Curated annotation (Swiss-Prot):
<dbReference type="Pfam" id="PF00312">
    <property type="entry name" value="Ribosomal_S15"/>
</dbReference>
<protein>
    <recommendedName>
        <fullName>Small ribosomal subunit protein uS15</fullName>
    </recommendedName>
</protein>
<dbReference type="GO" id="GO:0022627">
    <property type="term" value="C:cytosolic small ribosomal subunit"/>
</dbReference>
<dbReference type="Pfam" id="PF08069">
    <property type="entry name" value="Ribosomal_S13_N"/>
</dbReference>
<dbReference type="GO" id="GO:0070181">
    <property type="term" value="F:small ribosomal subunit rRNA binding"/>
</dbReference>
<dbReference type="InterPro" id="IPR012606">
    <property type="entry name" value="Ribosomal_uS15_N"/>
</dbReference>
<dbReference type="GO" id="GO:0003735">
    <property type="term" value="F:structural constituent of ribosome"/>
</dbReference>
<dbReference type="InterPro" id="IPR023029">
    <property type="entry name" value="Ribosomal_uS15_arc_euk"/>
</dbReference>
<dbReference type="InterPro" id="IPR009068">
    <property type="entry name" value="uS15_NS1_RNA-bd_sf"/>
</dbReference>
<dbReference type="InterPro" id="IPR000589">
    <property type="entry name" value="Ribosomal_uS15"/>
</dbReference>
<keyword id="KW-0689">Ribosomal protein</keyword>
<comment type="similarity">
    <text>Belongs to the universal ribosomal protein uS15 family.</text>
</comment>
<keyword id="KW-0687">Ribonucleoprotein</keyword>
<dbReference type="GO" id="GO:0006412">
    <property type="term" value="P:translation"/>
</dbReference>
<dbReference type="GO" id="GO:0005730">
    <property type="term" value="C:nucleolus"/>
</dbReference>
């Protein structure tokens, strides 16, 4: 799929392993992986960060193959899932950083334009997540209160 606000086509992607079974050399059981996920989530890490740590430190390349569920579903079952979906969280974080930059550099017109693009992406994602029921129907992105969402 192509990029929304850029000319790139987005053709590059990483290939998942064809075999969906757990590697024979992996000594972690499903329960061990789940405990690691819970421990890392309680530290305040996002699901993608948890996946990177499990891949790099513990050797579990795909949590889904070991546990049978994705990291976010494991967290939801335990009640540890983040309030905001990760993609919208990072967009809000980016918008807050851009606003902070624009307070110091008022004449940076390119950043003003890019902020408009980022905020339009936030609104579009918010609309999508409201229809899917991930966000409450009365959720609304406001730039004034955005820094509290990502703090």
């Amino acid at each position: 799929m192509g990029r929304m606000h850029a000319p790139g086509k987005g053709l590059s992607s990483s290939a998942l392993p064809y075999r969906r079974s757990v590697p024979t050399w992996l000594k972690l059981s499903s329960e061990d992986v789940k405990e690691q996920i819970y421990k890392l989530a309680k530290k305040g890490l996002r699901p993608s960060q948890i996946g990177v740590i499990l891949r790099d430190s513990h050797g579990x390349a795909q949590v889904r193959f070991v546990t049978g569920n994705q990291i976010l579903r494991v967290l939801k079952a335990k009640g540890l899932a983040p309030d905001l979906p990760e993609d919208i969280y990072h967009l809000i974080k980016k918008a807050v950083a851009m606003r902070k930059h624009l307070e110091r550099n008022r004449k940076d017109t390119d950043s003003k334009f890019r902020l408009i693009l980022v905020e339009s992406r936030i609104h579009r994602l918010g609309r999508y997540y409201k229809t899917k029921g991930v966000l409450p129907p009365n959720w609304k992105y406001e730039s004034a209160t955005a820094s509290a969402l990502v703090a």
